[in-house]
A protein has these predicted regions:
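Catalytic/RNA-binding core of pseudouridine synthases
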Residues: 1-149
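Generic beta-strand hydrophobic packing signal
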Residues: 48, 92, 156, 172-173
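Short catalytic/ligand-gating loop segments at beta-alpha or beta-beta junctions
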Residues: 154-164
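A general structural signal for well-ordered secondary-structure junctions
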Residues: 150-153, 177
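Amphipathic alpha-helical interaction segments
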Residues: 23-26, 161, 170
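Single conserved hydrophobic/aromatic residue that forms the stacking wall/gate
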Residues: 169-179
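Short, flexible loop/turn motifs enriched in small residues
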Residues: 1-2, 166-168
């Protein structure tokens, strides 16, 4: 038995989040299906972090246990040949059996992108929140500063994760994407 660590990136637009849900298409469900088909085993991945419906991820960590003879380092290539184009395995490798992504990979980065213009951009609209009124970046920076530091989110977290430390907030002036 070995444990394989995956670094997963996905466009969550077409998924009902990460976690398996009855009668819904989820990222975890798609990974379980394709890894099971590849290995011939009933595979259940364990993810470091769950995302909500429609949320994208770059670098989400997951592991699974397998008896497969496919080396951990080759699993990314083998899976990418089978997965839909909106899910990519960026890297794969074998890790110790006691490695758990929820406890070893505890740092997360969230990015929220606002597209501020008179009209939305249909080419990139799945990856930003559209705001047509002018934004005051200085006021946004001032408001964001209140989130820095350590905060107790007991009402919104499991009993194991009640305190969160927020170390950096970066707000930048808008840029235009030339296509």
């Amino acid at each position: 038995m070995k444990r394989v660590k995956l670094i997963v990136a996905y466009d969550g637009t077409g998924y009902c989040g990460w976690q398996v849900q009855p009668n819904e298409i989820t990222v975890e469900g798609v990974l379980n299906k394709h890894i099971s088909e590849l290995t011939g085993e009933d595979i259940k991945v364990i993810g470091a972090s769950r995302t909500d419906s429609g949320v994208h991820a770059l670098g989400n960590v997951a592991v699974f246990d397998t008896e497969s003879r496919i080396p951990g380092e080759k699993m990314a290539k083998a899976l990418n040949a089978r997965l839909p184009e909106d899910i990519i395995i960026q890297d794969s490798k074998e890790v110790p059996l006691d490695y758990h992504p929820r406890f070893q990979d505890t740092r997360k980065t969230y990015e929220y992108t606002f597209y501020n213009a008179r009209y939305d951009n249909p080419v990139t609209s799945r990856h930003h929140h559209f705001v047509y009124v002018p934004l005051d970046v200085e006021k946004m920076k001032e408001a964001a500063s209140y989130f820095l530091g350590e905060h107790c989110f007991i009402s919104m977290c499991s009993s194991k994760a009640q305190v969160t430390s927020l170390s950096l907030i970066h707000i930048s002036e808008p840029t235009r994407l030339a296509l």
